[in-house]
């Protein structure tokens, strides 16, 4: 049976005898929606699921307050509210379990949340004014949490500034989550350090996000920083953080270990026994930097990086046909061999047109074909941003909205493909009929718009798609685009160090911050200052002491896995492993459809040697542009 009027509220409203004008107005936007989010009603496991829960649906994590308000107001013919007797409203009875509720108890009768919703119903379930009640800024205190030992705790305070200038402490309603719970465990707004390491707290409130870094250092006494040689700015920035965290870096690896490591990383091949003996016997103080130059200039370097870019760009005859895949591979290979500036390489793909055989860069569009997957691929590969979550709803962990998803996709909406004159040839053009990008919710036409401000030579969003693509290409590769250079150096860094400064490398977002922001900024600036030169970037990383560190750990860095204080053991890729076995045994593998003496790294397509050794050890099928498609775990897949 429902209670008609709890004593607490009776005293609040009857004894106070407040008039409607004296009672502060409670609105859905400012007061009620945060409660639904905090209590989990809009979570993916509850009513925020794609199809809702038990016949009732809300937007995921409350990204669409208008939809949620209308669902509450009009679903069940408005039977969720009883204005004559608010306490008998289903919206209060279910979460307090006065009637059966699959979600269990969400809050108690008489609690602060109960009182807010009660007042909202009594005042007429007002939506509120977005021009006044929307959150404009979220602030978190402290700015950083630094704990001297596991077991220490800290309290997080969250305040919101609304569109009308009003401010409120929203600590109780804000959602605070840790990206590494076994380092920083969160209970409501309290965080406790549980082990040595680093974590980031993501604070969410009404579509706004803030992050808070948490560091728990080693409490062990006796630490004394021992300076090691610093080859360049990479070492200075890495050491600055390590010293602060009481982590002593490992010394450099020996010559044989360095030769093996850099040979695999730059050309994907092990050194021969003769090369090992010669390098170890060499007494030159500059032999390591000279070796890097030699490897970068080798044909094997071109093969190795052609393979990597072929994976990312999904070069496969499944999508492109045999000739298309060959032509695209040769274009990638020529770009690597010429050391084409990376921004030029990307612009050539984005601005390609005409025959997929005459302009092989046009094959980039033949993989995804449609505007939405094309946009998703360009942002993930070239910016490290995953927009796919925003196709159906606002991104739950980032600022990207569903509107922005379709505005970005509109840059490619008129791109079309038609058959060419040769077998398998397609012509890329920019005048597809009915090319308007429409929002799935209401059908309105979405005009192209950048997700972030950056430079390009035009003004506004061009009306013709050829110009749209030009605008997009210039914006994406602009020197002041905050993601382009950073995502590139971060990806390349991961190839050499085993993990990115931001990891995963293609998931850059506020809730996945860099482990060393100063290092990432410096690498990006250096890359831009040297005109997006990939070889220069690799040379800079390879010559650093950080890259050349030993895998052997000490008592101060044995638990470090994020700050590059020592090298991380890495498994050889499928192609590297096969070529290594060929070198060790003297038995050259034979690939169907490939010339004799073809190495595994020279195989042009994932369909060559399909379901054999390479696939067993993790070769990607090039079905996705995600780095995660290549398996590098130690367990073999069962067949």
Regions found by a protein language model. Give the residues of each.
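Hydrophobic h-region of N-terminal signal peptides that target proteins for export
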Residues: 11-20
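Solvent-exposed helix-loop boundary motif
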Residues: 19-114, 132-159, 168-231, 260-261, ...
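Catalytic cores of secreted or luminal carbohydrate-active enzymes
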Residues: 107-127, 636-639
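Bacterial N-terminal signal peptides that target proteins for export
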Residues: 1-9
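Primarily short, surface-exposed interaction patches in extracytoplasmic proteins
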Residues: 226-300, 305-595, 615-616, 620-629
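Helix-loop elements that line ligand-binding/catalytic pockets
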Residues: 600-603, 623, 627-636
């Amino acid at each position: 049976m429902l209670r008609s009027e709890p004593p607490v509220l009776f005293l609040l409203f009857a004894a106070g005898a407040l008039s409607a004008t004296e009672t502060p107005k409670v609105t859905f936007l400012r007061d009620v929606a945060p409660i639904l989010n905090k209590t989990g009603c809009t979570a993916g496991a509850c009513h925020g699921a794609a199809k809702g829960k038990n016949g009732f649906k809300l937007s995921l994590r409350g990204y669409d307050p208008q939809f949620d308000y209308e669902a509450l107001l009009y679903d069940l013919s408005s039977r969720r509210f009883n204005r004559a007797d608010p306490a008998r409203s289903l919206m209060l009875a279910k979460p307090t379990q006065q009637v059966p509720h699959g979600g269990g108890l969400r809050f108690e009768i008489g609690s602060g949340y109960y009182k807010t919703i009660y007042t909202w119903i009594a005042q007429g379930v007002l939506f509120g004014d977005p021009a006044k009640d929307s959150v404009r800024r979220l602030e978190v205190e402290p700015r950083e949490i630094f704990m001297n030992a596991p077991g220490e705790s800290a309290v997080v305070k969250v305040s919101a500034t609304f569109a009308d200038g009003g401010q409120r402490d929203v600590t109780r309603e804000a959602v605070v989550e840790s990206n590494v719970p076994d380092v920083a465990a969160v209970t409501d707004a309290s965080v406790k350090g549980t082990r040595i390491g680093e974590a980031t707290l993501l604070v969410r409130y009404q579509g706004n996000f803030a992050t808070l870094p948490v560091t728990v250092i080693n409490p062990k006494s006796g630490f004394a920083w021992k300076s090691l040689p610093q080859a360049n700015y990479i070492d200075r920035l890495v050491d600055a953080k390590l010293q602060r965290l009481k982590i002593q870096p490992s010394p450099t690896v020996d010559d044989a270990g360095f030769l093996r490591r850099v040979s695999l990383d730059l050309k994907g091949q092990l050194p021969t026994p003769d090369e090992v003996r010669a390098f170890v016997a060499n007494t030159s103080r500059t032999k390591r930097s000279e070796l890097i130059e030699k490897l970068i200039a080798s044909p094997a370097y071109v093969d190795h990086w052609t393979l990597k870019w072929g994976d990312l760009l999904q070069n496969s005859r499944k999508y492109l046909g045999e000739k298309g895949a060959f032509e695209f591979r040769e274009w990638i290979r020529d770009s690597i061999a010429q050391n084409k500036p990376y921004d030029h390489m990307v612009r050539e793909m984005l601005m390609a047109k005409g025959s997929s055989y005459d302009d092989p860069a046009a094959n980039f569009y033949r993989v995804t074909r449609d505007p939405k997957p094309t946009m998703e691929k360009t942002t993930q590969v070239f910016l490290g941003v995953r927009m796919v979550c925003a196709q159906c709803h606002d991104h739950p962990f980032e600022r990207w909205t569903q509107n922005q998803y379709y505005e970005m996709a509109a840059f490619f909406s008129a791109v079309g493909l038609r058959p060419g004159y040769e077998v398998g040839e397609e012509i890329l053009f920019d005048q597809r009929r009915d090319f308007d990008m429409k929002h799935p919710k209401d059908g309105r036409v979405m005009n192209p718009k950048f997700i972030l401000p950056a430079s390009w030579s035009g003004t506004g969003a061009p009306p013709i798609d050829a110009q749209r693509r030009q605008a997009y290409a210039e914006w994406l590769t602009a020197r002041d685009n905050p993601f382009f250079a950073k995502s590139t150096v971060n990806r390349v860094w991961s190839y050499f160090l085993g993990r990115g400064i931001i990891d995963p490398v293609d998931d850059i977002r506020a809730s996945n911050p860099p482990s060393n922001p100063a290092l990432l900024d410096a690498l990006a600036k250096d890359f831009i200052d040297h005109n997006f030169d990939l070889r220069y970037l690799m040379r800079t990383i390879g010559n650093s002491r950080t890259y050349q560190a030993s895998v052997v750990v000490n008592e101060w860095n044995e638990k470090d896995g994020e700050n590059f204080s020592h090298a991380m053991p890495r498994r050889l890729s499928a192609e590297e492993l096969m070529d290594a076995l060929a070198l060790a045994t003297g038995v050259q593998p034979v690939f169907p459809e490939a010339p004799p003496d073809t190495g595994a790294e020279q195989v042009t397509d994932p369909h060559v040697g399909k379901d054999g050794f390479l696939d067993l050890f993790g070769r990607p099928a090039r079905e996705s542009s995600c780095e995660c498609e290549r398996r590098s775990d130690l367990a073999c897949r069962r067949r």
